Swiss-Prot record, chains A, B, C, D:
GO terms for cellular component: cytoplasm. SUPFAM superfamilies: Glyceraldehyde-3-phosphate dehydrogenase-like, C-terminal domain, NAD(P)-binding Rossmann-fold domains. The gene is argC. SMART domains: Semialdhyde_dh (SM00859). The keyword Cytoplasm applies. This is N-acetyl-gamma-glutamyl-phosphate reductase. The keyword Disulfide bond does not apply. Catalyzes the NADPH-dependent reduction of N-acetyl-5-glutamyl phosphate to yield N-acetyl-L-glutamate 5-semialdehyde. It comes from Geobacillus sp. (strain WCH70). Its EC number is 1.2.1.38. Pathway: Amino-acid biosynthesis; L-arginine biosynthesis; N(2)-acetyl-L-ornithine from L-glutamate: step 3/4. Belongs to the NAGSA dehydrogenase family. Type 1 subfamily. GO terms for biological process: L-arginine biosynthetic process. The active site is at 149.
């Protein structure tokens, strides 16, 4: 099968390529870049070496539609909402790693993103690709909206609690910590090594665009869920997200009950691993892999549940989950091309 | 004035020395170490160079009592509770950077620290050295118990809210992130570079010994305060603590009111700097200095206050605050020897 | 095929497992540990998850000989020289990642390692596994001595120059920079995060045990080679070695000639990639992979050649090259199980 | 005394301010910025807090000449060569941290910097501010050209060997490793955290503009010195330079002789510290301070001397040495305002 990657020279794009190069069902990737067309991919990323035919091409939607069955967008806001409709109309499958199709309500999108997005027609047919919980819809999707990195970590951690209605609906707080690669490859003072190293920063306090994305899914699971508090911190590391999640239990719980619930919820999910009592995952334990590792605690003193959910933001939080969704959409083994162990240390 | 440092070869000790070397009222520091007596300090720490008389001495309480007016303990649990009483009885002033004298209730200490501590007699006379809020008692103290690094960041961030009773008493959550130097200089797998770098870990979930220390002070300010949720994360950096604090407002607040309260609360405190609306401090902005920087947000969607409080764990969280307390105890300018600007970048 | 790993809980061991898990010709790995036998591997390394049968076993050479065709030693000095002879005598193939069998001359070993090693009988039959240059001998080896991390980077960078006798024999200087994982997983002050982070250190000046290993191979290629200067620096990163190599050209050279030589030397080597004129590799460009990337410069002002050679110390510098040697020893495709792309960023 | 800083919002500028704020002889610093005039300095650098009068001003040379006795340039190439002549002509003292006035020969400047610089008139009166070795000239200087960071580390390490003619004149190789802050505060892909972290890069191979600066000084000390090999590596840390220096001894030396020479050479230099036999400095041991620490080795096997010289690139390699030069120019104590101990860890 031929696939195309638009935005191949960003971190999401290069990570898609890392996995797709060894994917058993993908024969060829065409790489597109609006800024670097004409040059060989290895000029930007010498680590990939000499891949045959890896010349970056100018974005040409018509050509893509002729040559490829699936197109991945690993692009900044506003690109996929502009280009994807033509591809959709021509019958191409689209997997969008940007936020353009994630929010069903355009006014919510505009409020949080401060810009316009696609028309309702396309927004409504977009399927939200949180693979573990939306598999049926994903199987039928033509337009797949891949979740944000933070929402992936937060939602996989919250799902069992929210669906089972074990926690107070107005008590959810997510304190998230992310590596720097989540900010993309564009150079800025915020990603300057000397500003990030030996430093922890909070950013976009109460205003991160992933807040409505998380709430939309939580409300789909339990309509009573109230607005959440969600904070994002920049940590001096390249990869990894940890979401530390706090919520008040409706009634007294036991750690055993909680862990049973999580184990059961994810027993068929190859990529979600629940830790033993008293053990919690570190981000490095999923480094470079598609795993989401989860640890759970219950505190009798406060009646609060603490859930710790970690992912590699570029894999399960972006390229890996996108390929997982590709696998589901095509009816392939969900794990195809994704069974790489984390790199440790 | 002559002072002594016990535990001079730990990170707390070497940081005490960095500031005391240039302190206008301190003439000589005697350095004591149980493990390295007889060698010159610069053997362990070449960065200090040739300081005259910096031979590490064997711990001898009698000799100290003869030669020094003030003794600093920068030691592991159990040392100061054993040695300080003799010094106290001989009229020496003691400033203890360990946790031995922080909790007034011995049973609480034993539950969280899993060991015994000093007798009630000494516990009761120990003054808790959160300088900004306990100045009157500190002026009269002979035995000063210097706050823990996390409690310093958390309490300075919480004080105005709790004292003014603006928040629900059962709603406090503190999500804290710390650099590795907080774990001390002892080598262990937990501080191994290859295990810490490119990694975020949560540890001691719901069981950190700083929880009762924070709660003790909060209850002294407002007896209705309920048990808090307090989480600690290890971040791949050497210095710095950020406490991200969440609490539910009792009634609707405005950011303006909140910032006014914080500005007023700390207007006489040289070392606490409150940020402008919409601005939040990063740990690097206090690096190497005795500052605690604070930013505040109020979220109308959730009715929650978010407070971000950052310190250098080895300075305001340890050696710096200890010297600030020394200054207050001796009646000197509170800032003596401490007015070093943060190092940036 | 069944294989065994002795020293499975070190960084070399866990990296062997990462690659062997997906190796097409390896059916089962038995894991041995002298310090942690009886526990499941995932207790030490949660990132690997639930691998069936990954209980760490007590080292039992007889049992290994019965069950396994190949035994890997990823052990500290002195272990393989003690245990390997029995395995060899029983016909088992041994691949040793330690330095025990690398030096042919016992007195040289004793001078640099300050300890004794195996008897001459076994030393002489050991084949040095610098795969790209010793393939014929490796194919016939029963006892394979895997090169050190530094020697791998240095020798692959020097080989074409030395074999073609293009450089003055007394002019070789290798300035090497290594990540911390090269020091192993044992906790020590030298690997403490707070001591390594924001720091560069030189160590073992003129006394590193890899010096005789490099010289032995260089002299095998050109007996006139004189003692080299070789310096090792500890860099605040987990993985990666860069060897910056300096040597005086015997006569004027051109960059074109040099690059032709390198391209030709390695044209059949999948894992050695030579950069274009003016381009030099960074360690991150081989991260997690078995590649050795090389860049070359010639300076007309000084008449010196500069070669920059980078590897991942745990892969091409240890586990990866060991598996590459396994592949050659067994007559399999040299790349089997090793074609993972570097992780970037 | 009033001084001015042009380019106050770069890393050199902010570091000048850190030291000058506490300088006993400096009463007021005026801060100038071409890009951010009109805003308060703390908007760019919240860590400095509320300094009275720290509004960034538009560059106005006439005004500066009226108000200030000394002007520091911490600016990109081309600024000081344009603006300084007016100040010089008006009798203002100028200390230039850029490279504009470092090379006496304009054609050499143009070859290495690929741009034009000041006229011969000003180049010839500029005094090169390697304080330890040029003190007499510095005392009389009106235009002081502050050395580059790499040349400072390299020259302080080489001086005793070159002046005493102990080494072969064509044998000098300097392998330098630098933290990222040396590249300035401008955002670029080369300083992006995700590209720098877990990575070592070599850059400007055989073409760094500091090469002629080092050679010019070496030749002033010994006219027979031949072109040197000088390599620069980017290391994942914020501050610090290590220069590892290799040279062939003319005749057999002893470590004792060498160390005696270094100790004697620097016995009157407060800021150069020579290590004991067998000990070598790490960059962290001078962090945030004006020290240059030096270790020396002699290898009998190769007849080569290895010198390890470390500085904080922003202090002794920039702002600190500039203030040291200010002190000498004004006849003040050379250490005024500079006696801060390194921060460790």
């Amino acid at each position: 099968m031929n696939i195309a990657i638009i935005g191949a020279t960003g971190y999401g794009g290069v990570e898609l390529l890392r996995f797709l190069q060894h994917h058993p069902h993908v024969h060829h990737c065409s790489l597109y870049s609006s800024s670097q067309d004409g040059i060989h991919f290895s000029e930007s990323f010498p680590h990939v070496g000499e891949i045959e035919g890896a010349i970056l091409q100018k974005i040409d939607v018509e050509q893509m539609a002729d040559e490829c069955e699936v197109v991945f967008f690993a692009t900044p806001p506003g690109v996929s909402s502009t280009l994807a409709p033509t591809l959709i109309d021509k019958g191409v499958k689209v997997i969008d790693l940007s936020g353009d199709f994630r929010l069903k309500d355009r006014s919510v999108y505009e409020m949080w993103y401060k810009r316009q997005t696609a028309s309702d027609h396309y927004l409504q047919q977009a399927v939200y690709g949180l693979t573990e919980w939306n598999k049926e819809d994903i199987q039928k999707a033509q337009l797949l909206s891949n979740p944000g990195c933070y929402p992936t970590a937060a939602l996989l951690g919250l799902a069992p609690l929210v669906k089972e209605r074990l926690i107070e609906e107005d008590s959810i707080i997510v304190d998230a910590k992310s590596g720097v690669s989540g900010a993309g490859r564009k150079a800025s003072l915020n990603t300057h090594f000397s500003e990030v190293n030996e430093n922890v920063k909070i950013y976009k306090v109460n205003s991160h665009q992933h807040i409505p994305e998380i709430e939309q899914m939580l409300k789909a699971w339990n309509e009573r869920i109230q607005p959440i508090t969600f904070s994002t911190h920049l940590i001096p590391m390249t990869r990894g997200i940890m979401a530390t999640i706090y919520a008040k239990a409706k009634k007294e719980l036991s750690l055993e009950t909680l862990l049973d619930l999580y184990k059961t919820s994810y027993e068929d999910s190859k990529f979600v691993r629940v830790r033993k009592p008293g053990q919690f995952p570190a981000t490095k334990e999923v480094y470079g892999s598609n795993y989401c590792d989860i640890g759970v605690a219950y505190d009798e003193r406060t009646g609060r549940v603490t859930v710790v959910s970690v992912i590699d933001n570029l894999v399960k939080g972006a390229a890996g989950q996108a390929i997982q969704n590709l696998n589901v959409m095509m009816g392939w083994d969900e794990e195809s091309g994704l069974m790489l162990a984390p790199i440790y240390p």
